Amino acid sequence: MKWLGRAVFWLITLVIIFIVATALVVQTSWGTKQISALISDNTRYKVSLSAISHSLSSPSLISLSDISISTVSGDFALEAANVELTLDWRSFSEPGWFARIIVQKGDIEISDAADSGTLPVSAGLLQLNQTTVRRTDGNRVIDAEGVTGGITPWQPQGSDLTGNGKYQFSANSLNYYGLPLKNILTQGEVSGKQFTFDNLTATLENGLLTATGRRSAEGQWQLDNLLLNDIRWQTPQSLTQLADSTEGLPDIQAKNITATNIKLEGHQWAVNYLEGTVKNLAFKQGRWQTDNGQADIAVADLTLSEQHFSDIISTLELRGDQIAVNRLTGRYDKSILRFTGDWNRATRTLNITSGVADNLLYSFPEQWFSALQESAPQGIDTIRLQDIKVSNALLIDTQPVFPFQLTNVNGYIKTIQILKSGQWGLWDGELSVSAGNATFNRVELHRPYLTLTAGADSAATTQFAASAGEGLLKMQFQTTLSGTAPFSFTLQATGADSQILSQWGWQPAPLTGSANYTLRLDGQLRAADIRSTLNGMLSGQDKQGNQINRAITQGQMSNTPVFAEPVPSAPPAQRVIPDNGEIK
């Protein structure tokens, strides 16, 4: 039987020699090229590598240098300076299994079509060192650079590329659906397409982001805690564009969000030093959803277009489609503002249930009246005001056609609707306004005051008067708020300067000094050119007996006198406004 022993010995020796020879050949440049060509020609993978290294001192370790692997379908690609494969006994019974896979200085691209069959490989540990990972999902890209870390074990299953295991990774940068993160560190567990992160920290726009939570298999982010600190974020987008862009973000559900010292800036808007907490709030397709959401937010400075607000404090409750504004305070210039109310998203209705404006200084924007003739911006249909108090306000309009200014303005709105079905107007309520002094196109008025009552389809003044020098002006205004909003206006002047109307753009009257006169007009408030719709009459008489009776047609005063009833001589003007300025 000695011959059998010798045969076995020589057979084993030949096998070892063959293995060693094969290993030596494979490690040559010629052998490496042959293996690359063999795989590329007979599988769905395109493979190239510069060298295969193996050492008898580390028999379980195989090193692949300058390796490139990609699928013909394009759903996976890997390029790396070096890939180390560590074998164990399981590798011989399960092809494709490795005790450890290390990818160094690599670049990995994965599409949403990739699955466990894309690269039938698994490992006890998958480790990445300074690797770039890029995943495409339709038109959206997740891009991570400088990734270092690992997942154990790594066993892709079905459409899942990660399997079940624990992970810990760091990355120099991560672009997640346009959100630029840097210096990322995270750890947690992964189960299929769902993973949890026990800790996630990152730098966001020079600030700090810290979070704990999970991502569901459906792609929804569930955040237990999210902390944002010292973030400085800029965008070229307007608020409208920014809101539209959120529709493409993945769904987010947050139990608790805390923000401190945040600065945000975009096109014609800026938020400085935002702090606050938000609880139990979800965003799905750019829309918030909650049944018991709460928000406490403070902002040191807020700029919207050219309007600047400061020291804003708000307390909100969110239920279904409704936001209850339990508290909203702030400053506008030197004024103090306080409001409560609610917003209903389903009906697009804003109710301001109480409000106070003290020492308000407000300059009307250009074309403000034209804006009121147009429909309101999309997204809001109704605005109702209740219990609104204004004290010691200053209102200014500097447009050159008809500038005006009102000082020491005081007003009260018991209830009124100012927006209905997207149209501006006054419905269903009453208001009163008074001012210490006013100037309308260089005509000074003293103690003007107005009370107005509005119904379902019309509005009218019940009191409307002011002193002008030694004279008195009484006015009446009534409008129907449907269609072109036809209106009627009457001005009765008693002992007033006869040239007031010429200061207001009308043809000079043939009257001198103080006079009694009446101006009656009918027109359409929603016309593009209101003056061209004006029709009416001007009649009056001064102290010298000079009279005027002129018709007004399409905004032009006739030079030809018309028949009118004699204007009665009025008694000397009496001040009907008390010195204390109270409205009677």
What residues fall within each predicted segment?
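Terminal hydrophobic membrane-targeting helix
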Residues: 19-114, 179-181, 195, 207, ...
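Conserved positions within tandem-repeat grammars
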Residues: 179, 200, 300-302, 307, ...
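N-terminal Sec-pathway targeting helices
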Residues: 1-17
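Membrane-proximal interfacial segments on either side of biological membranes
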Residues: 3, 92, 97, 106-168, ...
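A structural feature that tracks compact, well-ordered secondary-structure segments
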Residues: 186, 198-201, 212-214, 314, ...
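Fold-core signature of tandem repeat domains
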Residues: 147, 174, 195-204, 209, ...
